């Protein structure tokens, strides 16, 4: 699966524009005063301004598989990295996933992850910078607890998605997709790892390719 565009909402549009352009040094365009488009390698991330809520999301950005330590050093000069109590480190070592990650908050409270996946052939030799943000790699999806299993079955059937082969299904956590792109799915109010921040259901549209077809996933679903 490849995530092409991630459309999100924010109550802090100008602050995010400054953060992603000046702090993370990513290309940011503002097609109008209510929207920004952030170029993340092969993906686009679009924030549209909202005044009715303060949405927040979880997403991960893929980096070269040999650059997690450099990415940590680069980021630590720009943001406060989140500490993982279970690893006693600010680098999470997901042994079963063959991956390592670092996490931080952006100014809107989004939980941002940089992930290096060792089973992808994408090593890089140049010094780490935001030019090595390769794509949006994970998107967190949230469903109501009472519809959790039903909604996952709907995703599997409608978009030809399958369970990530490195993550057995758990009652409160699922991963659909592959190393190139994942939906990480939790029930509403479950804390986003590695924080104590409960997940919420906020509007999003994900444009992605899977098994040779292109899809648009809009959440929450419209009746």
Tell me what each language-model feature is.
Residues 31-35:
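Long, internal scaffold/assembly segments composed of regular secondary structure
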Residues 96-99:
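Short, small/polar residue-rich loop motifs at catalytic or cofactor-binding pockets
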Residues 89-92:
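Surface-exposed loop and turn segments in beta-propeller and other repeat-based domains
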Residues 1-3, 9-29, 39-87, 105-223:
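Glyoxalase I/VOC metalloenzyme domain signal
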Residues 101-103:
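Short hydrophobic/aromatic beta-strand element in the GNAT-like acyltransferase core
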């Amino acid at each position: 699966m490849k995530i092409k565009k991630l459309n999100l909402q924010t109550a802090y549009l100008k602050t995010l524009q400054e953060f992603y352009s000046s702090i993370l040094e990513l290309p940011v365009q503002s097609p109008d005063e209510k929207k920004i488009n952030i170029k993340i390698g092969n993906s686009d991330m679009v924030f549209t301004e909202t005044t009715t809520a303060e949405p927040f999301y979880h997403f991960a950005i893929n980096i070269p598989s040999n650059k997690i330590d450099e990415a940590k050093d680069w980021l630590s000069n720009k943001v406060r990295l989140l500490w993982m109590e279970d690893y006693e480190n600010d680098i999470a070592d997901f042994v079963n996933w063959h991956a390592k990650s670092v996490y931080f908050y952006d100014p809107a409270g989004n939980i941002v992850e940089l992930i290096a996946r060792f089973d992808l052939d994408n090593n890089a030799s140049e010094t780490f910078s935001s030019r090595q943000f390769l794509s949006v790699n994970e998107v967190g999806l949230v469903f109501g607890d009472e519809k959790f299993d039903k909604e996952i079955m709907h995703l599997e059937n409608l978009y030809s998605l399958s369970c990530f082969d490195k993550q057995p299904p758990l009652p409160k956590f699922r991963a659909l997709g592959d190393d190139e792109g994942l939906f990480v799915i939790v029930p509403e109010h479950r804390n986003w790892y590695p924080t104590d921040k409960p997940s919420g259901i906020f509007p999003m549209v994900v444009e992605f390719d899977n098994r040779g077809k292109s899809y648009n996933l809009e959440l929450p679903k419209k009746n």
